[in-house]
Each structure stands twice: as structure tokens, then as C-alpha cells.
């Protein structure tokens, strides 16, 4: 394995690049945006071993209202491509968790999911009505939310994408969800009551615990790394709390 410091993704997939650009543009709208320093061994990872080619690039930032803005771009053995993004709110602010994942296998989008997941009690009242108005009528292959998906909002979107048109429409859904998130973040005011902050921390902890029940994440990584490395990566890079 060779770890390198990279400034932009090496992936050339048009859909991933379009989504990545959209996410970065919305991220740039956040106040007081700063990069977060992390272990370079965990941020950018490359392997050129034939048959086990691997490329992972991570971006870490923080901003007003957000403790961690994480974007991961990955390609495994040239046939599995992943874009993963989670924006974790600062518990002092009543902002939902933005999450988005795209999985392509041999250029087929098997999974596309986006959500603003509640990070406090009754938080959904603030934004569910806006999410429900986002047009999702064009998609033909909606997928069932897994059992651990109780962490998601009522308007989580999860589907396989069957055409270029659906790929374009998914980009629009992501754009609208991000726009709602940015609006909520700009309206949010800091909270200083410890019991409220603790409740929000517990929501984020539960979000991470439930996400770690997704065995597909570890199954992919275990093909390239040992169990100790995979557990550390999942708990420190993907879903820390």
C-alpha cells in the first residue's frame, strides 16, 4: 500500500465528478470553513497491485455549525466506485445530518441514497415539508430501507438508477437537499444548555452505531485490509462520535 497526498480525485466517472462538484460548491457556502488535519495514512490510500487496485481519497473540513464535513471517493479493482459523504453537525447547533452515498458496479448505479437525518428530537418538523416537495417522481427502482435505517428521515431517498436521465435527476435531488441544509445551517443559533447538547450528541452516536451495522462497508474493505485496520477506519474516518 502506498499513501499519497492528493489534491483532487483521480476518478474520471462523470456522475461522481458532477456530484462531487455540487457537494464541494455547497460546502464552500458554509461560514468559517476550515480543513481538518488527519493521519495521512487514513486520508489518501493507493494500491497498484494487479487485481487489487485500490484508490481512496478523503476530504475533511469543519465549519460553523458542523464538526466534520467528510467526503470519500473510492475505487476498488477498477469495477467498484463509491462516493460517500456525511456532514456531521456541531451539537451546539440544531442542524440535521446530511448523508449521501453512490455505489457503481461496472458502471451500473446499484445504490444512490441521500437524506437529511434528524440529529435531535422533533427536528424533522423544521425541514421534512421541504424535503417532501423535492420531485422524486421520475425514479423507477426505489429500494427498501434496511432495518437499521430508522435513523433516516421520512423523506430519505434510496434507489438504483436505471438511466442517464435518472442519474441527472438524482443530482438534482442531492442539490436540493444540500440547499435545504445550507439554509438550515445559516438560520441555526448556538445552544448552550448541556442537556440539549448531550441529547444531540446521543443522536449522532446512534446514527454512527446504526451505520456501522451496514456490513457491506466492512465486507468491501476486508478484501484489501485486515480487520483491525478496517475497524479503525470505520470508527475514526467514517463514523466517529
UniProtKB/Swiss-Prot annotation:
EC number: 1.3.7.5
Coiled coil: none
Matching Gene3D superfamilies: 3.40.1500.20
HAMAP family: Ferredoxin_bilin_red
Keywords per UniProt: Oxidoreductase
Biological-process GO terms, alphabetical: phytochromobilin biosynthetic process
Keyword Oxidoreductase: yes
Catalysed reactions, semicolon-separated: (2R,3Z)-phycocyanobilin + 4 oxidized [2Fe-2S]-[ferredoxin] = biliverdin IXalpha + 4 reduced [2Fe-2S]-[ferredoxin] + 4 H(+)
Superkingdom assignment: Bacteria
Species, as recorded: Prochlorococcus marinus (strain MIT 9312)
GO MF terms held by the record: cobalt ion binding; phycocyanobilin:ferredoxin oxidoreductase activity
Entry function: Catalyzes the four-electron reduction of biliverdin IX-alpha (2-electron reduction at both the A and D rings); the reaction proceeds via an isolatable 2-electron intermediate, 181,182-dihydrobiliverdin.
Family: Belongs to the HY2 family.
The name this protein goes by in its record: Phycocyanobilin:ferredoxin oxidoreductase
